[in-house]
């Protein structure tokens, strides 16, 4: 019966057309071109959305290199665009990665310094990273971008990032349930640090606010109308293996995934007198492309070319991004 179904469109047009999407993750094995693909997708989304944010959660922070522009932990407009913004965060860096102003309240009584918050959570292993993520999600959500694209770290870190909303929601929930027992201790602790204007209620309110945002984000991440994941791979064994592992883990987490990008492909004509290495490489890729077609027949599989030059700078990304929408045709390229 499957053979009678028309193959799905080999592009990311379906994602650009899906106006309900709020969160798009792009990930895969290291070195497959995730940043180029996520940046290109963000450029295409900027054509049809009011405002787009691309966030790098990879400590390597390659989007600065991709757009040839330095980005920080504060959303910055990308050169050459009116509605595309970029920021780089390192979830592993914890609360130290966040600017001081993210810890400010509307009045003096609600202000909690980063140092105090850091001291209080240092005794809880892993909570620093989780709190950092929670604050970032709270920040991003408050900015009301039409859609957010995550340029993620290699697979292992990505799976941890995806699971964070659930982890944080459970962790903050436990902390809040203990707040009545901890309140006297917390009050004494901040008093010892000379922070008279900070009390347990202030910290509790911070946690309440965070929990509310994270609960909402957790619900959205599991809603295919609002969240999806794009897997990027190359036509090689280890990359395909990582992709299958990633797809299975995402499915377990309840995250929608129905788009795969196969990057760095050689497009050779049969009559083309190519070098022996190119011909061998082409045969290897053909083998794994056949496996991808069998494994992911119900996915949109987009094939991208291996280029002679690197994709760097806004104009270069704009040009390359067209390959996400229109299947690459080597004949058209050679005629230009």
UniProtKB/Swiss-Prot annotation:
Keywords: ATP-binding, Cytoplasm, Endoplasmic reticulum, Hydrolase, Metal-binding, Nucleotide-binding, Transport, Zinc. Zn(2+) binds at residues 275, 278. The keyword DNA-binding does not apply. SUPFAM superfamilies: P-loop containing nucleoside triphosphate hydrolases (SSF52540). It is an enzyme of class 3 (hydrolase). GO terms for cellular component: GET complex. ATP binds at residues 29-36, 236, 263. One of its GO terms (biological process) is tail-anchored membrane protein insertion into ER membrane. GO terms for molecular function: ATP binding; ATP hydrolysis activity; metal ion binding. Homodimer. Belongs to the arsA ATPase family. This is ATPase ASNA1 homolog.
């Amino acid at each position: 019966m499957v053979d009678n179904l028309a193959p799905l469109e080999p592009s990311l047009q379906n994602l650009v057309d899906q106006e309900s999407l709020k969160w798009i993750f792009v990930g895969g094995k290291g070195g497959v071109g995730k940043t180029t693909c996520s940046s290109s997708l963000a450029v295409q989304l900027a054509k049809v959305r009011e405002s787009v944010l691309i966030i790098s959660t990879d400590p390597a922070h390659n989007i600065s290199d991709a757009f040839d522009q330095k980005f920080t932990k504060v959303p910055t407009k990308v050169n050459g665009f009116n509605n595309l913004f970029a920021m780089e965060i390192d979830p592993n860096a914890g609360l130290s990665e966040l600017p001081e102003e993210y810890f400010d309240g509307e009045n003096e009584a609600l202000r909690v310094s980063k140092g105090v918050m850091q001291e209080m959570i240092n005794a809880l292993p892993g909570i620093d990273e989780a709190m950092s993520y929670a604050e970032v999600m709270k920040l991003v959500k408050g900015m009301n971008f039409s859609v957010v694209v995550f340029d993620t770290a290699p697979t292992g870190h990505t799976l941890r990032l995806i699971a964070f909303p659930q982890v944080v929601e459970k962790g903050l929930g436990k902390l809040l349930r203990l707040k009545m027992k901890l309140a006297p201790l917390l009050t004494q602790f901040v008093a010892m640090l000379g922070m008279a204007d900070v009390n347990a209620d202030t910290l509790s309110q911070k946690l309440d606010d965070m929990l509310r945002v994270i609960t909402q984000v957790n619900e959205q991440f599991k809603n295919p109308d609002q969240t999806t994941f794009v897997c990027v791979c190359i036509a090689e064994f280890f990359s395909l293996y990582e992709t299958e592992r990633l797809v299975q883990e995402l499915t377990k987490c309840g995250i929608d995934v129905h788009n795969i990008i196969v990057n760095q492909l050689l497009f050779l004509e049969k009559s083309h007198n190519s070098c022996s290495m190119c011909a061998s490489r082409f045969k290897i890729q053909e083998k794994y492309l056949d496996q991808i077609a069998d494994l992911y027949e119900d996915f949109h599989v987009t094939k991208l070319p291996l280029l002679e030059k690197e994709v760097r700078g806004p104009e270069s990304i704009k040009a390359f991004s067209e390959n996400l929408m229109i299947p690459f045709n080597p004949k058209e390229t050679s005629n230009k």
